[in-house]
Amino acid sequence: QLIMALQTIPSRRLSPQDSAVVSITQINGGEAINVLPDTVVLRGTFRCLSNRVRARVRELIESYVATQPQVSDVQGEISWFPGYPVTKNHALQAQQVREVAAATLGAQAVRWNQAPSMASEDFACMLEACPGAYFWIGTDGETPSKPLHNASYDFNDALIGPGVAMWVGLVEKQLPAA
């Protein structure tokens, strides 16, 4: 019941304009198939597109866990591990990435104003400390490849040149000519 309740937070407790994902990714409890375990450990993640929604989701998770004893005679406690903040690009740096990408890879290769992603990214910490922009270089070749974070993922070596060219272009744009 708790898992189902937690996963309905985005659809039932948030505004449709407030994107969020709640995922229970591990359930561990007991060793024997015919004995109810004393404890069960649930682990998971949640991701949002704003710090306001992040705080609300955390509040709702705490509320759901706190009310479980009333519903199913179980006790719950939460151990929070710091996740990454929301990844938010700065406008000027994002525009510079767009310009360099168009000049380096060709305007047809640049996809701008894509829908926000629920990816979790440690680069978000850098963006909180200083202006910058996070961007993706697509990994597909002529045919779609396995997605990142997949055991079958195989890096497309043909991307090394375009990737290096992007970084060189960004460095040249940022540093004055000597």
Features from the language model and the residues they span:
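Metal-dependent amide/peptide-bond hydrolase catalytic core
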Residues: 3-178
